[in-house]
From Swiss-Prot:
Gene Ontology CC terms, in alphabetical order: endosome; myosin complex; plasmodesma
Species whose genome carries this gene: Arabidopsis thaliana
Region feature (Disordered): 1-54, 68-95, 968-1007, 1075-1118
Name recorded for this polypeptide: Myosin-2
SMART domains linked: IQ, MYSc
Chain ranges of the Myosin N-terminal SH3-like domain: 160-209
PANTHER family: DILUTE CLASS UNCONVENTIONAL MYOSIN, ISOFORM C, MYOSIN
Record remark: domains: IQ domain mediates interaction with calmodulin.
Expression sites by tissue: Expressed in flowers, leaves and roots.
Compartments where located: Cell junction, Plasmodesma; Endosome
Signal peptide (UniProt feature, chain positions): none
Protein residues bound to ATP: 304-311, 353-361
Amino acid sequence: MMLSASPNTLAKSSLEEMLESLRQKDECDRPKDMPPALPSRPNSRARLPSARRSLPANFNVSSVMEDQNGSVVSVTPAVEAESERKEEGVKRKEKDLGVKRNSFGSKKMRTGLRSESPYAAEKEEEGVKISIAKVSLVENTEEHNKPESEWNNNVEYFIKKKLRVWCRVSNGQWQLGKIQSTSADTSLVMLSTANVVKVSTEELFPANPDILEGVEDLIQLSYLNEPSVLYNLRVRYLQDVIYSKAGPVLIAVNPFKNVEIYGNDVISAYQKKVMDAPHVYAVADAAYDEMMREEKNQSLIISGESGAGKTETAKFAMQYLAALGGGSCGVEYEILKTTCILEAFGNAKTSRNANSSRFGKLIEIHFSAMGKICGAKLETFLLEKSRVVQLFNGERSYHIFYELCAGASPILKERLKLKTASEYTYLSQSDCLTIAGVDDAQKFHKLLEAFDIVQIPKEHQERAFALLAAVLWLGNVSFRVTDNENHVEVVADEAVANAAMLMGCNTEELMVVLSTRKLQAGTDCIAKKLTLRQATDMRDGIAKFIYANLFDWLVEQINIALEVGKSRTGRSISILDIYGFESFKNNSFEQFCINYANERLQQHFNRHLFKLEQEEYEEDGIDWTKVEFVDNQECLDLIEKKPIGLLSLLDEESNFPKATDLTFANKLKQHLKTNSCFKGERGRAFRVNHYAGEVLYDTNGFLEKNRDPLPADLINLLSSCDCQLLKLFSTKMRGKSQKPLMLSDSTNQTVGTKFKGQLFKLMNKLENTSPHFIRCIKPNSKQLPRVYEEDLVLQQLRCCGVLEVVRISRSGYPTRLTHQEFAGRYGFLLSDKKVAQDPLSVSIAVLKQYDVHPEMYQVGYTKLYLRTGQIGIFEDRRKKVLQGIVGLQKHFRGHLSRAYFQNMRKVTLVLQSYIRGENARRLFDTEAKFHADSVSEASTDELSAVIHLQSAVRGWLARKHFNSMQRQKELRNVATKSKRKAGRRISEDKDIPLEQPQVQPTSMSDLQKRILKSEAALSQKEEENTALREQLRQFEERWSEYDIKMKSMEETWQKQMSSLQMSLAAARKSLAAESITGQAGGRQDTSISPFGYDSEDTMSTGTPGVRTPTNKFTNGNTPELRIRELNGSLNAVNHLAREFDQRRLNFDEDARAIVEVKLGPQATPNGQQQQHPEDEFRRLKLRFETWKKDYKARLRDTKARLHRVDGDKGRHRKWWGKRG
């Protein structure tokens, strides 16, 4: 209910009045055994908005917690209020005591109740329920229930509980120990080594319990202090766990070795959310998810000292984004390969890092609406040009020079006149030509592969290599002093000749430019000889100009290859990898610019994590305890402020021709001595107190490097070179001039001003993104694995403001949404739709429905602020509800689609049936007409074919009869001739004795014997001749009888053949007529689809036709069955016809064989005659009669079946005919 207004409540909003009444009511109803409220971490009272906002009258806030036994109990607002009042009292007493941050007995202390308990409550389940730590439950309970007076003396409490503390020993290291006693400002501490030391109480810091050793996020530490943070990072580092969290900031410690925490398997695990441990992959994944969810550009800002691992971290982030947003175009692979190119041309070995980035880069990766990479854009800042010509001992120039000399092919070396790296002055001056464990030749081959992948043509590659070789040969150009004034001339050797050849200019012109300078005196042009120093600067200036422009041109080519296409949506993730903070023994203009860039990045870091955060809390009226931090704005003012900032004074001095580095140093001391970040030194030196520490600078070379002069004669020489790239560079240089280029002029904009403009442009771009910070830490200065230098790490942590980040993250609200945004995104999750529809009421109702603890959020005037992890709970629930909605919609849409499909299917089938029926009827008419025409033609053709066949058979029979007659005639002639020969032989034998001469009587007996034998042989021959004649007569008689019978048989066969042919023709004509008549008559009332039959002459068995949709009939006899019966009958007719033809052929062949036997009888092997042709003929006739009788019976049956089918067709109508 709503309380009436009173003087005490007039200033309160309606929401506060309602909350107060609910708290009072809960206090009355609170059970006696209610456990004490948990100490709030961070300190928050969930302040509600002022009277401008109001909540529903029925609004109630309650939370849940777990007691010591693990059961869930309710924590009412009254309990929270009582706890808050106790906390306020504790804070007031601690403020009166004056305690240093997390130490004992100091003057100041920024309290957070989290640091007062050695065993603080662990994180809640799902970020909503707070659970008490399961370790030392008894001590935990005692801490919550002990009197407030015990907290007033932390040292006594630690002595009583024998808790561990951190103390700094004489060597500056932190060690664990236990307080033995205390007096005044000193304490006796027993170290873990059993030694007792006396230390200042202010130097004691509480140590965390063992359960918190090596936690992933520093926020989880019960006591937040420098030794605890150092120890936690050290434990993880020695376990090769190099990534930790400090609230929203990822801390990456360089392991200086390969660790097995990368690769496709790990990438897949983070993509699928299987792993959530701190990792650069996790940061990249969070940036990608936020980009897709919020549709806002993201940025990964990687910072740290030189050698801390920024470049490698950036490569791993790009690797993850390439895997996450990889598409079909393959641009992500090109993006990864750009790193290889940029490292070769922009990285070098320094005293602190073997692969130090000597330029800053921002790579902006663009994504399509589907989250796929569609292109990228690369920006670079302040390449260290001086490294091309000047090196400190133990350092190297850019990697590309050494890789080119080591890995170029013999043909390329011959073309570029290349030698080994040791023969070039620019490379050999530092006595460092190689890097341990690095193969420059192999690196060069990988570079060539990267060039091909990024699609830089071979021609452009060779041009770039030619200019690199020209730079190396320029370094070998030497000078000869010609007079006492130290004027010089160029030595004409192979160095200047090769340099001129590679640049595409005349050797003499190059020598003139290197040794003289043209001055304009009125209308006259005077050539002034240069001194050795001036000539050397001119030579080095040309080399630096060529290399710097070549680097910029290479970046342009990469941007062309990675250009974003039409799929650009404005969504992007930028990765910033810039040189780290540097402080060497000798620090010049380059270190000043690098440290200035890091100061600007630190300000961006402070702005987003401290300034904007706390300003927004205060403006929106939420309860907030301000966190102090070190602001570097004063240092930035020292550098940037006009007109007496360091850069402004540098530009002013650079414009004075007679100004020197000493006059510049004096001017700095004169104008900047009041700034606390500046300290003048003797001579040309001065100190700047940067955020990362104090750096001593030497102004030697500041003015010259800031001017970066380039004489007009040099630009004119480059523009006249045959090399296309040099012409391009000179054209760009002319275009950058703000006024017409005169002979003695150089470009006007100074390097410092240009770099400042680039930084401001970079900051503006980063301001329009959601930043994700990665702080890289260098564990030791020797670049050795498993070496942890606490002082070096602590210095970097202080510079990064890690402890302040953790404090503000503990008590901060990283997620903030306007009431409208929160209600619009999560309002549909409400189960109660009766809630007022204003955004604030909806937002509070959602929080109430999911029992979000008041400590986990605050309600501002315009926004809702949530602790870390709370938004993930609402996103998970929203995702589940949306998935359920989508599933329901899917099933409903599926039901509608299936119903629509079934309806369309029914309509389609009806339409198809009508169309198919019409097509079938048209086809039947066409085939019937064609069949009638083909039948008439077929009958004519068949008649002519029969006549032709008969004529052929008759001719064959006539020829056969003629041949048999000829053979008989030949046999008679042979018999006659044999008779005549026998008669002549007999007459000759009778005449022999008459012709013989007289013989002696002694041989008479022999002659008589021979005569008797001859007579006997003659009589025997006569008898055989008589028998043969008789046999011939009998054969002639039998032949005449056979001839008569054969003629009679042929006549009978021909009659029967004609009769069967006539009967078959009549049956076919009758069948065709009946089929045509029945189908034509039933066209409108039958459902049988028309079928066409083969013509009678071919006797085909095919039955083609068109089917129509089937239908159900009451008598169970479907059209399909009747069609099959009709087809069966027609098949039977075809079968009978084929059988008739086959049988006819068989009988013809048998009869022909009988005739052949009759004409030429042969003897069997045993000498007996074969069976007589008459017997064979009788058997053949019997077989023919039997087959004819059976064939006629089957013809009658088939005819009857045809009549029956025709009757069935007449009794049934087509189903669509009935519908009509």
